[in-house]
Amino acid sequence: MYKRQLSNFAGGVLILIFKPFKVGDYIVVGNYEGTVRTIELLYTKLTTVDNKVVMLPNGTLSNSNIINVGAEDYRRLDIEMSIGYSSDLKLAKTLLNNIINANPAIIKDREIKVIVKSLDESCVTLETRAWVKTEDYWDTKFTLLENYKSEFDKNGIEIPFNQMDVHIIQ
């Protein structure tokens, strides 16, 4: 027990000295992510997006990979969309590009891309890449996803989903 407390104390000292994050930053550590609420000597408290409080031992934190999402003012927003092989690829890319460029939260002087990410078994996976202010990330992502779906529906672009054919043998 003392070994664990000493590890948490040492981790707390390291966090306070090296400052890999600060109160208010949004971090990802292992299976946990949230906004840093307090940094104490033994524990760091996060609040998750669904308002749960997570107490992470500083010993664990100091020995983990920490992704500090809130450290920078801007964040790249990557969204994957799949279309059917029979859908018009050029039209789908044009629609995605138009939607991104029409969104006021997108930083227009940074690179905006619509690419074919992969050719999969049952679909063509496209990806959009654009930059937003970190605080606009989630709202912009949700808005873009809804707009992508709506425009694909209006223009007959199929979004495939997994299907299972069941054959009954008598």
Language-model features: locations:
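Conserved small/polar residues in nucleotide/adenosyl-binding loops
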Residues: 1-5
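Short, structured beta-strand/loop micro-motifs enriched in basic residues and often containing a Trp
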Residues: 6-15
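Hydrophobic alpha-helical membrane-association signature
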Residues: 9, 95-96, 140, 144
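Soluble accessory domains appended to multi-pass membrane transport proteins
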Residues: 14-109
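Solvent-exposed, non-transmembrane regulatory segments of membrane-associated proteins
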Residues: 69, 87, 107-170
